[in-house]
């Protein structure tokens, strides 16, 4: 079923597709394009990586952090752009094996592990901490991978004054507390597939 998901995340021409409803993608671009970010950080590589590089001409550097080796390879093969710094950083503690499980049982086991990643910082510590080791500050941060509640805090610390942090799938309750710590985030409406939440760092 993971292979089928990978196929779904590719467009009809084999290119990486943005896994967002068109309404949410329009909301994202309405925020990002006027911001004219030069340095962008994202946790969770894929269609958004390709979209940023092709549709946001102000970008000089895009740092993208991915935790899944197979998906990292797909993104690396699909995007050839000198502005991209793509990093593979796996979990500090491996997810449970799904060998021999039905698709439903495998999804349940992985979902339980992903929820643990929102509560137990040691599970994805290196993944969350990798951007800080690079010595950059960012104008835009997109949180769309694993351990999002911890990436929110880490990304906020690396954000330039006046910069923007975006969270995808913000309707999930496990992320709410981390976003509220940023001050006055806005949950965008309407949404159909994965809600966006935006917070701007005071200048």
Regions from the language model: what does each represent?
Residues 1-38, 110-123:
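Class I SAM-dependent methyltransferase Rossmann-like catalytic core
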Residues 14, 27, 32, 51-54, ...:
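N-terminal targeting/anchoring "stem" of glycan-biosynthesis enzymes
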Residues 21-97:
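SAM cofactor-binding core of SAM-dependent methyltransferases
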Residues 43, 67, 145, 169-170:
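Generic detector of well-ordered alpha-helical packing
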Residues 76-135:
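S-adenosyl-L-methionine
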Residues 128-140, 146-203:
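C-terminal substrate-binding/active-site "lid" region of AdoMet-derived donor-dependent transferases
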């Amino acid at each position: 079923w993971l292979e089928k998901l990978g196929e779904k995340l590719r467009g009809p021409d084999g290119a990486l597709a943005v896994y967002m409803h068109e309404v949410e993608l329009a909301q994202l671009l309405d925020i990002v394009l006027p911001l004219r970010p030069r340095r962008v950080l994202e946790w969770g590589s894929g269609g958004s990586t390709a979209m940023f590089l092709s549709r946001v001409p102000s970008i000089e550097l895009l740092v993208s952090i991915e935790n899944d080796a197979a998906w990292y390879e797909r993104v690396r093969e699909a995007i050839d752009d000198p502005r991209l710094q793509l990093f593979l950083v796996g979990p500090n503690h491996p997810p449970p094996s799904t060998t021999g499980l039905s698709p439903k049982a495998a999804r349940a086991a992985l979902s339980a592990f992903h929820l643990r990643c929102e509560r137990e910082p040691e599970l994805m510590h290196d993944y969350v901490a990798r951007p800080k080791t690079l010595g950059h500050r960012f104008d835009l941060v997109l949180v769309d991978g694993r351990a999002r509640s911890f990436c929110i805090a880490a990304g906020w610390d690396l954000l330039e004054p006046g910069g923007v942090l975006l969270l995808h799938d913000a309707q999930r309750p496990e992320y709410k507390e981390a976003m509220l710590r940023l001050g006055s985030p806005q949950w965008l409406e309407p949404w159909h597939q994965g809600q966006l939440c935006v917070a701007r760092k005071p200048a």
